[in-house]
Swiss-Prot record:
The keyword Zinc applies. The keyword Chloroplast does not apply. It is found in: Cell inner membrane. It comes from the Bacteria. The lineage of its organism: Bacteria, Pseudomonadati, Pseudomonadota, Gammaproteobacteria, Pseudomonadales. This is Protease HtpX. The gene is htpX.
Amino acid sequence: MMRILLFVATNLAVVLVASITLSLFGFNGFMAANGVDLNLGQLLVFCAVFGFAGSLVSLFISKWMAKMTTGTQIITQPRTRHEQWLLQTVEELSREAGIKMPEVGIFPAYEANAFATGWNRNDALVAVSQGLLERFSPDEVRAVLAHEIGHVANGDMVTMALVQGVVNTFVMFFARIIGNFVDRVIFKNEEGHGIAYFVATIVAELVLGILASIIVMWYSRRREFRADEAGAHLAGTGAMIGALQRLRSEQGLPVHMPDTMKAFGINGGLKHGLAGLLMSHPPLEDRIDALRRRG
C-alpha cells in the first residue's frame, strides 16, 4: 500500500509540474488567443482520475481475472506428488524472498509457461501450466518459480499498473488538447465540441496510445531482466539459464494464455527490430546472455 501511495503522490506532483510548465511557456495564452478556453490544471486532474482508475481496478481484480481467463485451479489440498512438490517449493522460495506464501495454482496448457499476479506482494498468485509441471525437470520448474517469485518480491504487478496509469493520464490529456486545438483553431468551431473534436481526440488517442505502449513495454522488458536476476539469486544462475534455454527450445509452440496475462508470463519475446518495441518480454537469447554476464 505504501508503494501505491508514494507512486500516486509522485505522479500527482508530475501532473502539477506539467501544468505549471505549460503555463510558464505560455501554452494557456496561446490556446486562449486562438479561442480555446481550456483549464489545463482541471483537465490534468480529470485525466489522472480516469487514467489511474482503470489500471488500479485491473490491479485489484487481477487475481480473479487471471483465474477466470486461464482456468487456473488453486491448490488448497495437494492431491498428487506434483502438487505437493509445487506447494513446498513455492513456500520455500517465498520464505527466501521475504514475502508471504502466495496462492498457488495450475492452469491447463501444453506449453511451458507460468505467471504471477496480485495487487500486493503479500497477497499474490503464482500459477504454472500443466505442461511446465509435467515436462520440465524439477530444477527447471524451480527456476521458473523463482523468476515468478522475483516478480512478486519486486512489486512488479503494482508498478506496472501505476506506470500504465501514468501513460493513460498523459494520453488522455494530450489527446484532448489536440482535439480542442483542431476543433477550435483549425475548424473554427465556437459552439461546444464539434465532430472535429471527437474525431481528432480519438485519432490522437490511438497514435499516442501506441507510443505509450512502447514505453510500457520497455519497462516490462526491464522488469523481466530483474526477475531473472531474482530467479538466479533464489534458484542459482545455472538453473535459471537452463530453464530459459529449455523455454527457448520450445519457442514456436502455440501460446494459449490470454493477451491480458502474456505480460506476466515467463515465456515470450520472439520478435526483433521495430516489432520488438511492443513485446512485453526481451528475446530469450538476450536474457540468457544477461545472466551469463552476471556470472
